[in-house]
Every structure is written in structure tokens, then in C-alpha cells.
């Protein structure tokens, strides 16, 4: 199963890239986590970021695999345990669906990205830096995969 991660931002710090790469490398062989980095929209000084979010939205929507379940990360989204996340993955696998996880940039996400989401998912009630959210999501997807596979990484 392919897991798609679409994230606004590029030129991440080395420690972000290393953390993300570590969980991708550890992912079980039948699960692949593929990252698509979206170039941030140009933000005009003094503007509210709406135009930048619209540009990013067009790039995000173009990057999503056709037919994928769009899972948009949002601080107001559904909170879930890792076991619940594993259940979502199992259901999507059983239905032959590709989940496309979307992480917005510094200005958040345009409503058009959220509107078509199959699920709004909150990693935390805390507001997380978008770069760090990549690493946390990769770890949680790895942990969920371990639950599905019966690997002892996750302990209740």
C-alpha cells in the first residue's frame, strides 16, 4: 500500500529530513510512504496569506493521487489514538484506497483543500510547526503499521 504525504514547504532543516527518512526506512516493505513537497506560495508583506494558500491549494490538489482518500491535518480535526489510526489504515487497505495525508504550510490550508477531505485529522490539540508535523506523522504511521503487523514497537 502506498501512503502519500503532501506537505507544503521545502528546504527543511537536516534534522527534520533525517527524522522523516528514518521512519520511511523502517516502514514495513508492503507499505511505502512517499513525500511530495509543495513549494510555498509567495506571500506579500502585509497580506493575510490568502493568495499564498490558494496557490498552495492548486499545487496540493494536483499532487494527490486520483481516487485517494484525502486526510487533511488540521488542529481542529478528529483526534485519534494510534490504534484508531491503525484501524483507519487497515480499512483503507481493505478497500484498496490510497490515503493522501496533507500538511499545510505556515499560513495553514485553503478551505478548498479541507472541503474535499475524507477526514480532517488532528495530530494534537497543540499547534505544531508544519516541519515537525511531518516527522510526527511519519512516526505515527510507522507505529500504526507496526500495530497492524503485530510488531512490538508499539506498547500499550
From Swiss-Prot:
Segments passing through the bilayer: none
Predominant location category: cytoplasm
GO MF: rRNA (pseudouridine-N3-)-methyltransferase activity
Family that this chain belongs to: Belongs to the RNA methyltransferase RlmH family.
Protein name per Swiss-Prot or TrEMBL: Ribosomal RNA large subunit methyltransferase H
Catalytic activity, EC: 2.1.1.177
HAMAP family: 23SrRNA_methyltr_H
Compartments where located: Cytoplasm
InterPro entries hit by this protein: Alpha/beta_knot_MTases (IPR029028), RlmH-like (IPR003742), tRNA_m1G_MTases_N (IPR029026)
UniProt keyword annotations, A-Z: Cytoplasm, Methyltransferase, rRNA processing, S-adenosyl-L-methionine, Transferase
Reactions mediated catalytically: pseudouridine(1915) in 23S rRNA + S-adenosyl-L-methionine = N(3)-methylpseudouridine(1915) in 23S rRNA + S-adenosyl-L-homocysteine + H(+)
Organism lineage: Bacteria, Pseudomonadati, Pseudomonadota, Betaproteobacteria, Nitrosomonadales
Keyword Methyltransferase: yes
Oligomer status and interactors: Homodimer.
Binding sites annotated in the UniProt record for S-adenosyl-L-methionine: 73, 104, 123-128
GO cellular component: cytoplasm
Amino acid at each position: 500500500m502506498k501512503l502519500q504525504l503532501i506537505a507544503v514547504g521545502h528546504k527543511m532543516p537536516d534534522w527534520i529530513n533525517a527524522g522523516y527518512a528514518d521512519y520511511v526506512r523502517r516502514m514495513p516493505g508492503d507499505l511505502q510512504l512517499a513525500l511530495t513537497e509543495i513549494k510555498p506560495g509567495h506571500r506579500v508583506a502585509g497580506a493575510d496569506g490568502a493568495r499564498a494558500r490558494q496557490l498552495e491549494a492548486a499545487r496540493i490538489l494536483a499532487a494527490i493521487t486520483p481516487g485517494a482518500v484525502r486526510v487533511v491535518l488540521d488542529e481542529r480535526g478528529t483526534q485519534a489514538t494510534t490504534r484508531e489510526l491503525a484501524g483507519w489504515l487497515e480499512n483503507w487497505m481493505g478497500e484498496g484506497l490510497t490515503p493522501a495525508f496533507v500538511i499545510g504550510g505556515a499560513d495553514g490550508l485553503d478551505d478548498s483543500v479541507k472541503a474535499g477531505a475524507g477526514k480532517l485529522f488532528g495530530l494534537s490539540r497543540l499547534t505544531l510547526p508544519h516541519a515537525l508535523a511531518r516527522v510526527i506523522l511519519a512516526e505515527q504511521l510507522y507505529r500504526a503499521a507496526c500495530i497492524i503487523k503485530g510488531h512490538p514497537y508499539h506498547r500499550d
